[in-house]
């Protein structure tokens, strides 16, 4: 065995600095801190407070509706998204080949992961399954207001229930998630549609069955692109005649179902679907949520797996992108090898919602809060201060103290910075009498107390 002589020089290598970094990285390390990647966020306490405020509201609402929380891995096989999510998301994947030569991706959405999780275990579970999650998701897309390369998302799903009651329940959860944060019907609207109804409408006006999916994908761009551009895409990409393109646009741009062409409304397939859709809206009215809901056939959702009722939530002023989107996806579990189960759900991101709360003055002011700050007059009282602090912490109180010897004035200033409600002052006299002084930091009132008074 080799050994080092005590008088021989020892050379310690820094495993980071000594790596053969390219010159531009060496310059970065030498001259400045590493920059944050574009489109990603840091969460110091002041910023984390808003994220926590949003997520806690989401959790409260989900639990009031009887949903259970779950999670999954942030890294999944890329096939889960290539086969199930549609081209738009596939083009935004953070994907790579891992050391096991597997094609993998950071999750861009949660629903395929949910389908995979349930595909392995749903057969033995009682239905309906009510689950929710708060994953961090990643998409390589252009950064703009309300859109980053990562975000936290509230996913809520009902699995195993095919009826419209589940669709109405899911949308009610989404609406209540925003109301819980102080938003009202003057702040946001839920625009709803039904892919089954839209598909029948397209067939009635003459869209070939094999062109329906492409038509929905193009129609999803309405609102983001001019109508003229969408019309050109229908003609150029799908080979529609000018007349058919106009009829398709008339369907999607109808102000209400009653404004559709009379000949279209007379078709029995259309009337059957409209009756079903009216039942869905009636349930929301019965829940007192009708003022939040508008029918909008342009809402088709871009993801390929949606099969029925779909919806998106928008701010009323139209200044932000969609706050939330969701709908029915009855075949997704089957597509990942699981039991064929009906399902409906939504995802709501924290980035655009944070923007909306800020615009409406609903972001809570960040305040540091601490129950007690323990102050000692001299080092002699330190052991007693530690005993008191630990006893209070064990009783569930938040307690801090200076970690170095400081003057009484500096300790009091530190208590103020920490947001302490009460300062506990221990001096030689108090130590001798087995008590201490409690000073209310708001009123300035002082009283002599013993530990049991605070427990």
Residue ranges and their predicted role:
Residues 29-48:
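Auxiliary tRNA-acceptor-end handling modules of aminoacyl-tRNA synthetases
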Residues 70-104, 147:
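Polyanion/phosphate-binding surface patch
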Residues 47-65, 76-77, 100-101, 111-123, ...:
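Positively charged, Gly/Ser-enriched RNA/tRNA-binding surfaces
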Residues 91-100, 206-228, 315:
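Acidic, His- and aromatic-enriched active-site or binding-groove loops in soluble protein domains
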């Amino acid at each position: 065995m080799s050994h080092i002589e005590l008088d021989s020089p020892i050379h310690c290598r820094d495993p980071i600095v000594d790596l053969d970094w390219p010159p531009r990285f060496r310059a970065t390390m030498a001259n400045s801190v590493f920059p944050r990647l574009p489109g990603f966020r840091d969460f110091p306490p002041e910023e984390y407070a808003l994220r926590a405020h949003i997520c806690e509201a989401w959790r409260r609402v989900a639990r009031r509706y009887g949903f259970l929380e779950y999670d999954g891995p942030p890294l999944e096989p890329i096939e889960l998204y290539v086969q199930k999510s549609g081209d738009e998301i596939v083009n935004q994947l953070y994907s790579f080949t891992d050391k096991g030569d597997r094609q993998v991706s950071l999750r861009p959405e949660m629903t395929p992961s949910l389908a995979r999780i349930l595909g392995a275990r749903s057969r033995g579970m009682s239905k309906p399954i009510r689950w929710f999650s708060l994953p961090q998701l990643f998409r390589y897309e252009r950064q703009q207001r309300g859109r980053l390369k990562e975000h936290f998302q509230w996913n809520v799903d009902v699995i195993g229930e095919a009826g419209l009651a589940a669709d109405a329940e899911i949308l009610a959860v989404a609406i209540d998630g925003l109301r819980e944060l102080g938003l009202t019907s003057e702040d946001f609207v839920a625009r709803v549609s039904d892919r089954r109804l839209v598909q029948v409408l397209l067939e009635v006006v003459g869209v070939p069955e094999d062109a329906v999916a492409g038509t929905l994908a193009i129609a999803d761009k309405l609102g983001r692109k001019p109508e003229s551009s969408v019309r050109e895409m229908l003609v150029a990409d799908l080979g529609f005649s000018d007349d058919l393109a106009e009829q398709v646009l008339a369907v999607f741009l109808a102000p209400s179902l009653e404004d559709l062409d009379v000949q279209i409304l007379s078709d029995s397939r259309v009337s059957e679907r409209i009756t079903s859709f009216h039942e869905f809206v009636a349930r929301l009215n019965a829940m007192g949520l009708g003022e939040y809901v508008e029918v909008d056939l342009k809402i088709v959702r871009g993801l390929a797996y949606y099969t029925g009722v779909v919806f998106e939530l928008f701010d009323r002023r139209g200044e932000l992108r969609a706050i939330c989107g969701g709908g029915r996806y009855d075949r997704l579990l089957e597509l990942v090898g699981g039991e064929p189960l009906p399902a409906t759900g939504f995802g709501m991101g924290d980035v655009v919602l944070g923007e909306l709360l800020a615009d409406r003055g609903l972001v809570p002011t960040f305040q540091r809060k601490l129950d007690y700050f323990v102050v000692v007059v001299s080092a002699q009282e330190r052991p007693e201060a530690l005993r008191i602090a630990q006893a209070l912490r064990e009783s569930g109180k938040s307690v801090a103290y200076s970690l170095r010897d400081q003057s009484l004035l500096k300790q009091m200033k530190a208590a103020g910075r920490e947001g302490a409600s009460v300062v506990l002052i221990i001096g030689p006299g108090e130590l001798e009498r087995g008590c201490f002084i409690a000073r209310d930091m708001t009123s300035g009132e002082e009283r002599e107390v013993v530990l049991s008074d605070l427990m």
